[in-house]
């Protein structure tokens, strides 16, 4: 998350952020902390929306689950923060994880396509919700 924050702040400084900022930085031991997520929210410029993609790591629930819960809390607290709940989609579709490391979906072309479609649709649903939602005042 900290490396992503550097890129995010550079994009803010260069004024290249789109209205909807999608943040998907929560896998492979991302260095999650509530404070870093708070910094993403507080740094978001006025007139923008933040879409947080919940992380999934089927090997353990520890930090990944805590990050997901905090992202859901942020979406309840701020009406310009939205959640693409990849974690929920991932656990509802165990077939995409068969024969994998439980971080990267798809052990064959069929399950790779299915996982990619599920991931994209999860984000699209959040974008659709944000399209009718508020921006940061």
Describe the predicted segments one by one.
Residues 19-25, 49-54, 82-85:
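Structural recognition of the beta-strand scaffold that forms the well-ordered cores
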Residues 38-42, 81-83:
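Short, functional N-terminal and low-complexity linear motifs
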Residues 42-43, 73:
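Alpha-helical scaffold elements within enzyme catalytic domains, especially in hydrolases
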């Amino acid at each position: 998350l900290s490396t992503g924050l550097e890129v995010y702040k550079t994009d803010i400084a260069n004024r290249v952020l789109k209205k909807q900022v999608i943040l998907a930085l929560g896998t492979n031991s991302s260095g999650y902390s509530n404070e870093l997520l708070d910094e993403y929210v507080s740094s978001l410029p006025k007139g923008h929306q933040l879409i947080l993609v919940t992380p999934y790591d089927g090997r353990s629930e520890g930090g990944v689950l805590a990050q997901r819960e905090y992202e859901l809390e942020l979406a309840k607290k701020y009406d310009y923060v939205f959640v693409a709940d990849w974690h929920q989609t991932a656990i509802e579709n165990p077939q995409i994880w068969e024969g994998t490391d439980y971080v990267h979906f798809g052990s064959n072309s069929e399950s790779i396509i299915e996982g990619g479609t599920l991931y994209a649709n999860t984000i699209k649903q959040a974008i659709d919700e944000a399209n009718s939602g508020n921006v940061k005042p």
